[in-house]
């Protein structure tokens, strides 16, 4: 049994579409359930879920309200309420390809050594086009973009599955614990780090997570996510979360993260120079803004 966990907060515009894409896939409805966790929605999300249930009576959907605000609280509630031995997290503002659930099910069934997996995350810009200032690094930050080719295998380097397209065996959380509720998004605040925290724990336990190119998720990107205010709040949230995450582990972990930040600044300066001499200064300037906001918050300023 697969449990698809969708944590949602005020996504009336998108929730029907993501549910519909799961329902109309190639994986049989009796082999999965949808665990929907409402994290105190104030819009018509519930009404849209009711509409989906009326239109798709063969799909098992269980609806829960998590009153503790925050994505990590909602994710943990999803784990506790799930009945499946495979837990798949799907973003509430996305859609998935028809073979999405079948891809995960087939891989876990034939590879018992795999503890977790994730697939590509492809942005869908509601504005119709990608901004000219977008770089690969900013794209990953703002849209969750993730693509490592068309062959399955271990995630390269220090990469790990995106939180909105990740599948786990339930035993993972029995081993490493639940999401850290001090990290992650909370209402309209844009913290993060809870996914990295989980995968860092998995690495320390020697667990395996695999990239599956056929488990594709399409992430809707509204125009406001491309504006300066959102960018500044998101990058500041990353720095704050990294500070909290590493200090929680210990001072040595925090110092190591500061050294990593210094190396990232060196790379940022090199890229800024590259974009300057190739007459694309907007891209370089955005990278500098990103790094500056993260560093400032990482230092607690």
Positions of the model-derived regions?
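Short, well-formed alpha-helical segments that are part of the catalytic scaffolds
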Residues: 11-25
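A conserved acidic beta->alpha catalytic loop
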Residues: 21, 38-47, 94
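Glycine-rich, basic loop-to-helix element that forms the pyrophosphate-binding segment
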Residues: 66-82, 103
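Conserved donor NDP-sugar-binding/catalytic core segment of glycosyltransferases
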Residues: 99-133
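Short, flexible, basic/aromatic active-site loop/helix in glycosyltransferases
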Residues: 137-159
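A short, conserved alpha-helix in the catalytic core of glycosyltransferases
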Residues: 163-168, 172-176, 183-215
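Non-catalytic, C-terminal membrane-associated alpha-helical segments of glycosyltransferases
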Residues: 233-241, 247-301
